[in-house]
Design a protein with these regions (language model features):
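Helix-loop boundary and gating motifs at the non-cytosolic
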Residues: 1-52, 212-261
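Juxtamembrane intracellular "pre-TM" segments in multi-pass secondary transporters
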Residues: 1-4, 178-217, 413-415
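Transmembrane alpha-helices of Major Facilitator/SLC transporters
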Residues: 50-53, 256-280
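Conserved MFS/SLC helix-loop-helix module at the cytosolic interface between two early adjacent transmembrane helices
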Residues: 51-89
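C-terminal ends and interior cores of transmembrane alpha-helices
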Residues: 76-89, 295-309
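Cytoplasmic helix-loop-helix junction between adjacent transmembrane helices
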Residues: 98-137
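Symmetry-related core transmembrane helices of the 12-TM Major Facilitator Superfamily/SLC fold
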Residues: 157-175, 379-397
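Helix-loop junctions on the cytosolic side of multi-pass membrane transporters
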Residues: 162, 170-189, 397-409
Length: 416
């Protein structure tokens, strides 16, 4: 079977894999299985702990043996985890499945962005990321409508369907996904499997230590991870147990949460479209400025959501958080990929940023869960919002120096 062009496959995966299964999962766990705030946060902690342990090793696998293989394994694993979450009912089994999801996700993280960057080149990947984001919004909206429609009848069935879609996507990638940009070491230079993996890791580590902006990017990823876990795990519970949802029409909760996501994605679609038109004229400093702006919106909206008791204001705040995240992601991917000039370690370096985010989430998750249990969900959300503030300082530092860190640039590059 003839393989498709890389951009066609990438846009197709953005369309199919953007189905927001996590929305119906969150409502299912709170409404049907009655998870406590601590259990919800522990799920995230289990996921992030596995990401912390395996993010970089699986990135090394992708750089050593191929990004396509890594992605297929990852899609099969995350799809299986979603499907089983819809089958079992034990809280601790579900916590374990969240850990499995995290492990499978590490095979995707880094490898996904590295694959398309190598296929199209660093000079073209920025517009591809932005256009892919627009495909993901369309796929998410269509998928959300389908999942919400199914979820109003059975949340369990909607969760299972979301997992099945990922498994089907993995099987399609086996036959349709190309890989022409990746070059494995020549057979004459290959050594044992563990030796090859270790060589890739050491090369990536030296590259990061010698790249000042990458060190700062990893710091930002750590701070964002510290902040995000509270909102990711507690936003639905905050609405359902504290703030309440509008009663007009008596819509089920899953419909409301689906509507929030749809509105945010529609805004994101048009904002990203506007950015795409002038993106090729934007340098690193311009991207950092946009990231600073949307990070400020993210922090302010998350804090407002934590403190308000009004359903209307809470909805506006959640939309602010979701819109900021929608727009920031393709900008972040482009900014990071611009700094990774060595294709042979691209997936590993990208995985390092993912590992920093996971460390932040795993470290902050249990603490914020205890705060939410002891002092209320709003307190956990507020602390999470305040933890985002150091990221603004790091972005501001990058802006003052045109996207570079001059003090670090004076350090000598490590010898090989």
């Amino acid at each position: 079977m003839k393989r498709l062009p890389a951009t066609t496959v990438y846009y197709g995966m953005e369309l199919l894999l953007s189905m927001p299964t996590f929305i119906v999962v969150a409502v299912y766990l709170v409404r049907d299985l009655h998870f406590s705030p601590l259990q919800l946060v522990l799920m995230g902690t289990a996921m992030e702990a596995t990401v912390f342990l395996f993010e970089v090793p699986t990135g090394v696998v992708a750089d050593t043996y191929g990004r396509r293989l890594s992605l297929i394994i990852g899609f099969l694993g995350t799809g299986t985890a979603w499907l089983l979450v819809g089958v079992v009912s034990s809280p601790w089994l579900i916590v374990g499945l969240w850990g499995l999801w995290g492990l499978a996700h590490t095979f995707q993280s880094g490898a996904y962005e590295a694959w398309i960057t190598d296929e199209v080149g660093t000079e073209r990947v920025g517009p591809v990321f932005l256009r892919g984001a627009r495909f993901s919004y369309v796929g998410a909206i269509l998928g959300l409508v389908a999942l919400v429609a199914l979820g109003t009848q059975s949340l369990r069935a909607a969760v299972i369907a979301g997992g099945a879609i990922e498994i089907v996507t993995a099987l399609a990638c086996i036959f349709l996904m190309p890989e022409t940009g990746f070059r494995r070491r020549p057979a004459a230079e290959r050594k044992g499997a563990f030796t090859e993996l270790r060589m890739t890791w050491h090369t990536a580590a030296r590259f990061v230590r010698a790249a000042p902006l990458l060190l700062m990017i990893i710091g930002i990823a750590l701070v964002v991870g510290l902040s995000s876990e509270a909102f990711d795990r507690l936003q639905e519970a905050h609405f359902l147990r504290d703030v309440g949802l509008p009663t007009s029409g008596q819509f089920p909760a899953v419909v409301w949460f689906g509507a929030f996501a749809v509105v945010a994605m529609m805004f994101g679609f048009f904002v990203v479209g506007a950015l795409q038109k002038r993106f090729e004229r934007s340098g690193t400093g311009r991207i950092a400025k946009l990231l600073f702006t949307f990070t400020a919106l993210l922090a302010g909206s998350q804090l407002l959501f934590a403190l308000t008791g009004s359903p209307v204001i809470a909805i506006g705040a959640v939309l602010g958080v979701l819109i900021a995240r929608q727009v920031m992601w393709p900008l972040w991917l482009t900014w990071v990929n611009q700094q990774v000039t060595d294709s042979s370690v691209r997936a590993t370096v990208l995985s390092m940023t993912g590992q920093a985010d996971a460390i932040g989430q795993a470290a902050a998750g249990p603490v914020l869960g205890v705060v939410a249990n002891a002092y209320g969900i709003s307190s956990g959300l507020a602390v999470g919002a305040l933890l985002l503030l150091p990221a603004l300082g790091l972005y501001a530092r990058a802006l003052r120096h045109g996207g570079r860190e001059p003090e670090l640039e004076e350090l000598p590059a490590p010898s090989s």
